Amino acid sequence: MKKAFNLTTCEGDADFLADPVETARQLEGYDGIELQVIDDPPGGLVDPALVTGLHMACVPCWYALWTGDEKGLLDEFGTLAEAEEYYGGPLTRDTLLSKFRRDLVWADRLGAEYLVFHIAESRVIESFTEEYLHTDEEICEACAEILDILFEGRKAGPLLLLENLWQPGMNLRRPEITRDMLEAVKYPNKGIMLDTGHLMNTNTSVDTQEQGLAWIHRVIDAHETAGFDLCGAVRGVHLNASTSGALAKRVKEAPPKLEGSYKDRTSKMFFHVFERDQHRPFTAPGVKDLVERLAPDYLTTELITMDQDDRRRKNSIQLNAIK
């Protein structure tokens, strides 16, 4: 099992890679990093030897664009001009695909062993209300379509890992959806990236890490009972904890009033999502046994950190919890 920690190329996040001493300090106990390329890094900053995996672009709201639903775009963005600004180009499928194709280029350039792709979709208001317009089936079908286009003609290459969230898509609440989603993708080198914190977020009764741990085992058990070997399909794990059930219930009962531009509304949404999806070290007794049960090829400590010292401290805490 290879161990990595999450890193982005946002300004300031990966700067330590220019310092070999600090890089070695940050990587203590780890085999590499799982990188998300947001800003193009300066030439030579990211040593391909350090990159274990690459996290593909996260686009929370994309279904209306993909299906050519102009009314859906107007309902979400207010104007088509705002939608074009959000997506960074014309309102076509190619604009969305270009974001993911850029990731494939970077994966090849950096020699990433695996890629992570979110199987989910959520409009801004749905992040608060959790009352969704689209079904798991609709989102998974569209995701499979996207991935089949992106990987068309590829018989081999990086391991493609489908990640669970708590919105519509492959959220692991329904074993038949998990099975069908994995089978729908034609690219052969594939598996699941199970995010433990995201899975905790599917149950708003989870308010402690112990409850979250028990819930994850229940989900695995439910898949086994349904005849699907979830542990066998899980090739990667994003290890973290999110115990925000009470917050989710409170916000759902009294969602905020969303005003201003789409950028203003998404800013409020992202602030809430980071409260909801806490990405803290998962340290409950039994987390080591969970990792051993899942037995992934890749384990990434995916945590929210404030600076280099905070990252190193939290990554160390997470590693110690599974020793």
Where are these regions (language model features)?
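Short, flexible/disordered intra-domain loops and linkers
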Residues: G12-F16, A64-W66, E70-G72, I125-T135, ...
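Histidine-acidic metal/acid-base catalytic patches
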Residues: M1-K3, L97-R102, W106-E113, Y187-L194, ...
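Residues lining hydrophobic/aromatic ligand-binding pockets adjacent to catalytic sites
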Residues: A24-L27, L35, D108, F128-C140, ...
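Active-site acidic/histidine proton-transfer and metal-coordination neighborhood
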Residues: G89-G191
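Acidic-and-aromatic substrate-binding clefts and catalytic sites of carbohydrate-active enzymes
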Residues: E11-A18, G29-L45, P60-A64, D94, ...
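N-terminal pre-domain/capping segments
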Residues: M1-R102
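Generic structural signal for well-ordered alpha-helices
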Residues: V21, P41-V46, F100-L104, C143-F151, ...
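Hydrophobic faces of well-ordered beta-strands that scaffold small-molecule active sites
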Residues: K2-T9, D31-L35, L50-M56, L115-F117, ...
